[in-house]
Amino acid sequence: MDEEENSEINSVQARDEDVQLEDQQSQGLQDRQVDVIEQAWNNAMPDEPSPPAEDAFQDPLATDGEGGDALEAMVENVLQDDTASEGSHPSSDMSLESPGSEDDSDLESLPHWMIPQNRLRSAVDMMVSQARNRDGGIAALLSGDNFLQRVRSMVFSQERRRSRTSEETSQEAAEQPVDPPPQQPPRPPIDIGFDTNLPAEHSYFGNHLSRVPGVDYLEVGSVHHMLIFLHQHILFPGEVLPFMIDGRMFDEDMPGLDGLIFGVSFPRLQPPEDNPHKLYGVTCQIYERGESGRGLVFYKSRALQRIVINCDDIKGSPQYIARNPTSKCFSKVKILPEYFLPEPLQTVDMGSMARFRDIPSMRDKYRRFQLSTTTWPSDACQEYSFSSIVERARQRLESQKIDTMPKCPIQLSFWLVRNLHLTEKMMRLTFLTDSVNTRLQLIKSTFKDETLFFCRYCNSSLALCSDLFAMSKHGVQTQYCNPEGYIHETNTVYRVISHAIGYSGEPSTKFSWFPGYQWHIILCKFCAQHVGWEFKAVHPNLTPKVFFGLAGSSVRIGKASEYSPFNGTTYVVRNMMRMISSDME
């Protein structure tokens, strides 16, 4: 009997020791989580972030602040993690009404005392959404006592709610549509009392530029040896590229000085893993030049044709044209073709009835006669109709006050890409295709998409693409050059989402891209990164009185389904959760 009692006592003591050990491990983990959270919060979201100096934001490429780089690197890591896990870990819902919205695939591999990462993320999202309407916001949430205990309580509350919800309710919640972005007040008609030719002339370079004659289109498929540069933005044929560079880069003895042609390639257009031995770009031809008085020369050039470069043919080290290149780089480039097939019905020979084709009152009847002679259904012909795509694009751009739409199908396809603001993936597809018809079909597929501008650094929403309008005759997106030679791709919008931006420095009228307007640097409210400029009229007769220019290097285009009013805040808190997870590993 004594042996049985001793055995039972020993087993109880062993269980107590195991429980005590688990409690110690859990407490140690919680202590580490608290330390990491406090450190991450202090680094990522200071209570009163001091705005960077004005000089630092003359161009985002010129800033090398340690804090900005650290936050940018941290944000890029999270973006990569989110992209990589998109298929297996869908974004958690912030509502308790959506049980089972997280992936449970990682539950079995974790100790029972550790909260799974997806459950932790869901609980933190809920706490963030509740804290945003309270005094103090997120800072008060993290500075309060027993933060981890409240996270655990929220996790357990969600678990209990999930267990009480039936499978039918879960399926119904999963099928609920994504909340659309908040409805902004209807935009009043924009009355532009401004000469839109001025930005297109880049008059901030001065009035002493001289014209350079010649516009040369090179033969399709031909190979040429020319000077090449790199560029951080994607240029499409027809765009104007202003830049400032050392005049010695273009020697007088170089062939073809009249309308000098050079190549500009885009490293971000072609991912290295796709085809590491090729670079895609455009040929550019200089049409105006002028001295700056500082040993640099102002140039205006226009993109003409798409090219492909074999990296093995590059002689030298290519440099970015926006960063004052100091050495020349030459390479062989091949001119890419542009194939365009006429509309299907235009290939149908109607004989003597063809004379009715251009009579407006007979056009519909003539079309019906054409359709009756083919095996194609009317919908198929309408789907690939060039005039149909042009009309739909015209209706979509009607609110942007653009009246310079080209009539040539090739030029129109490139022009639409610049003014419809496609996602980066779609821009890459439209640039790489040689078929104008395919390019127009890709553009047409985006007509129904509602898109927004998101901060490239923290993913918070900044403006609606429907608020774009043209302050230049070239359209809503234009390349501009600042006094330091950096080139900015600028998108002009009528307004931004409320409480999305802050300001840095003082407003100025020097080197203004829009004569008669002063510019003021704007920052993302969540991450304090440079995202563009506010332009305000200094003359009473100019309209609009205020508009915004979003820097293409600091924003990205995304679908409206990605919008969330918590995007920026939740992103920072999720970033801290990632750091906790990596620290535990």
Swiss-Prot record:
- Where does tissue-level expression of this protein occur? Expressed in the fat body (at protein level).
Identify the InterPro entries for this entry: CULT (IPR034750), Lon_prtase_N (IPR003111), Yippee/Mis18/Cereblon (IPR004910)
Miscellaneous section: The name 'Ohgata' means 'large' in Japanese and refers to the overgrowth phenotype in mutants.
- Biological process (GO) annotations? positive regulation of neuromuscular synaptic transmission; positive regulation of Wnt signaling pathway; protein ubiquitination
* Pathway note: Protein modification; protein ubiquitination
Protein's name according to its UniProt entry: Protein cereblon
Q: Name one GO molecular function term.
A: metal ion binding
Q: Where is the composition biased (Polar residues)?
A: 80-95
Q: Binding of Zn(2+): at which residues?
A: C455, C458, C524, C527
**Alphabetized UniProt keyword annotations:** Metal-binding, Nucleus, Ubl conjugation, Ubl conjugation pathway, Zinc
Provide the residue span(s) of the region labelled Disordered. 1-109, 156-195
Task: Spell out the Basic and acidic residues composition-biased ranges.
Answer: 158-167
Q: Which Gene3D superfamilies match?
A: 1.20.58.1480, Peptide methionine sulfoxide reductase
Upper lineage is: Eukaryota, Metazoa, Ecdysozoa, Arthropoda, Hexapoda
* Phenotype seen when the gene is deleted: Viable and fertile however, adults and larvae display an increase in body size and tissue growth as a result of increased cell number. Overgrowth is due to an up-regulation in insulin-like signaling both systematically and in the fat body, which in turn results in the down-regulation of insulin-like peptide (ILP) inhibitors, conv and ImpL2, and thus allows increased activity of the ILPs. RNAi-mediated knockdown in the fat body results in an increase in pupal length, adult body weight and posterior wing area.
Query: Keyword Transport: yes or no?
Result: no
Subcellular localization(s) per the UniProt record: Nucleus
Q: Which is an annotated Pfam family here?
A: Yippee-Mis18
PTM entry text: Ubiquitinated.
Family note: Belongs to the CRBN family.
